[in-house]
UniProtKB/Swiss-Prot annotation:
Entry's EC annotation: 7.1.2.2
Family: Belongs to the ATPase alpha/beta chains family.
Subcellular localization, as worded in the UniProt entry: Cell membrane
Protein name: ATP synthase subunit beta
Protein species of origin: Halalkalibacterium halodurans (strain ATCC BAA-125 / DSM 18197 / FERM 7344 / JCM 9153 / C-125) (Bacillus halodurans)
Main subcellular location: membrane
Signal peptide: none
Gene, per the UniProt record: atpD
Oligomer and partners: F-type ATPases have 2 components, CF(1) - the catalytic core - and CF(0) - the membrane proton channel. CF(1) has five subunits: alpha(3), beta(3), gamma(1), delta(1), epsilon(1). CF(0) has three main subunits: a(1), b(2) and c(9-12). The alpha and beta chains form an alternating ring which encloses part of the gamma chain. CF(1) is attached to CF(0) by a central stalk formed by the gamma and epsilon chains, while a peripheral stalk is formed by the delta and b chains.
Gene3D superfamilies recorded: 2.40.10.170, Bovine Mitochondrial F1-atpase, Atp Synthase Beta Chain, Chain D, domain 3, P-loop containing nucleotide triphosphate hydrolases
One GO cellular component, as annotated: plasma membrane
Length: 470
């Protein structure tokens, strides 16, 4: 057993000296366990991950838990391997921390459960799958204008409080209820309260049986927040590689992964790059994102909430993430202020799947006409603001009327928000979505009041509501 001793503790950074020629490898997990000397002393039980070899038989490590109670001279044991987490069926319905320890007060995970290291290589080129298949979400604005690809990476962009987490919760709910698929949720540096709410909501709806959850929340040290996404991904990879499943990996929030990496980088004494981020930003992001992919056996589809600092899309953190995405869902504060939920910007959201070869001619044409109508309305808004509606031509007035109906019809109630809104949520199949928007564009519902289109599911519900309004 290879042991060393702590020589220095600086917050979450711990230096450990080993005997000559017995340095642990980079990314190895080291364990520190020590009973408190008396009643008032803290019991120490912390895992450290080797980050740097400093020379002089010393390694610099990052703590995955609180370093309270650590003192110089404390014995440290090298486990000889990277941090590993449980994988397989035992993870479903359970909540874990970054080290794969259950934190849900349920039965402990069996000691003989299979485990996998969190640091792994991305799948080789020859193992990757190239076929493109659409993932139906039941959310109209997503399915119509920025459809998700199975095995793709999707980014949910938005500032604070525009609805990223609610959208993620709705996607987990819809995928589990409609597709019966396995999901892994990685809570990276977000609010503990949200994780708690999500767990209870999923338990109530029964979705939890098909979900594994891994949390490293805001109150955790930066080491845990930086590695928790890898822990969740490792669990998802097992279902893909060993069971051939199509798995959904939700990461909330990928910005916190970058933020934690930035903290760790500063603590390790690296020179910062642009806006104070770590110099290894692109490398760290690439190591995580390249493991999220479709292979010939199964797929991992990842949906990542991406906080945009001060709504600045040129910030290096969101900009680096953009490079890896197949589809983006942009949430816009102006829409949420208008009461349009989900507040997805129909013109800024993109997907490489929106092409006639993948979604079909009809879907593509309807989506493009919807975007053209909304774009024309956006251009006319300045004229309306200065001169009023009366100065528009009859043709433009019609475009504005249809655009407003489209804008409202892109909203819908969510199942996971029922307890707040009191309105039942709706799941709308893609065919119904295309039919509804096609008929609005054809002018079939020009005579119905605008408010009938707000927060409904299918077009038939609009007609029903319009009758009640009369």
């Amino acid at each position: 057993m290879n042991t060393g001793h702590i020589t220095q503790v600086m917050g979450p950074v711990v230096d450990v000296r080993f005997q000559s020629g017995q340095l642990p490898e980079l990314n190895n997990a080291l364990r520190v366990e020590q009973k408190g000397a008396d009643q008032n002393a803290v019991d120490v039980n912390v895992t450290l991950e080797v980050a740097l070899h400093l020379g002089d038989d010393t390694v610099r490590t990052i703590a995955m838990g609180s370093t309270d109670g650590l003192v110089r001279g404390t014995e440290v044991v090298d486990t000889g391997a990277a941090i590993s987490v449980p994988v397989g069926e035992v993870t479903l319905g359970r909540v874990f921390n970054v080290l794969g320890e259950s934190i849900d007060l349920d039965e402990p995970i069996p000691a003989d459960a299979e485990r996998s290291p969190i640091h792994r290589e991305a799948p080789k080129f020859e193992e990757l799958s190239t076929k493109t298949e659409i993932l139906e979400t039941g959310i109209k604005v997503v399915d119509l204008l920025a459809p998700y690809i199975k095995g793709g990476k999707i980014g949910l962009f938005g500032g604070a409080g525009v609805g990223k987490t609610v959208l993620i919760q709705e996607l987990i709910n819809n995928i589990a209820q409609e597709h019966g698929g396995i999901s892994v949720f990685a809570g990276v540096g977000e609010r503990t309260r949200e994780g708690n709410d999500l767990y209870h909501e999923m338990s109530d709806s029964g979705v939890i049986k098909k979900t594994a959850m891994v949390f490293g929340q805001m109150n955790e040290p930066p080491g845990a927040r930086m590695r928790v996404a890898l822990s969740g991904l490792t669990m998802a990879e097992y279902f893909r590689d060993k069971q051939g499943q199509d798995v959904l990996l939700f990461i909330d929030n990928i910005f916190r992964f970058t933020q934690a990496g930035s903290e760790v980088s500063a603590l390790l004494g690296r020179m910062p790059s642009a806006v104070g981020y770590q110099p290894t930003l692109a490398t760290e992001m690439g190591q995580l994102q390249e493991r999220i992919t479709s292979t010939k056996v199964g797929s991992v589809t990842s949906i990542q909430a991406i906080y945009v600092p001060a709504d600045d899309y040129t910030d290096p953190a969101p900009a680096t993430t953009f490079a890896h995405l197949d589809a983006t869902t942009n949430l816009e504060r102006k829409l949420s202020e208008m009461g349009i939920y989900p507040a997805v910007d129909p013109l800024a959201s993109t997907s490489r799947a929106l092409s006639p070869e993948i979604v079909g001619e009809e879907h593509y044409n309807v989506a493009r006409q919807v975007q053209q109508t909304l774009q024309k309305y956006k251009e006319l808004q300045d004229i309306i603001a200065i001169l009023g509606m009366d100065e528009l031509s009859e043709e433009d007035k019609l475009i504005v009327a249809r655009a407003r109906r489209i804008q409202f019809f892109l909203s819908q109630n969510f199942h996971v928000a029922e307890q707040f809104t009191g309105q039942p949520g709706s799941y709308v199949p893609v065919k119904e979505t295309i039919k509804g928007f096609k008929e609005i564009l054809e002018g079939k519902y020009d005579d119905l009041p605008e408010d009938a289109f707000r927060l409904v599911g299918r077009i038939e519900e609009v007609v029903e509501r319009a009758k009640q309004m009369v």
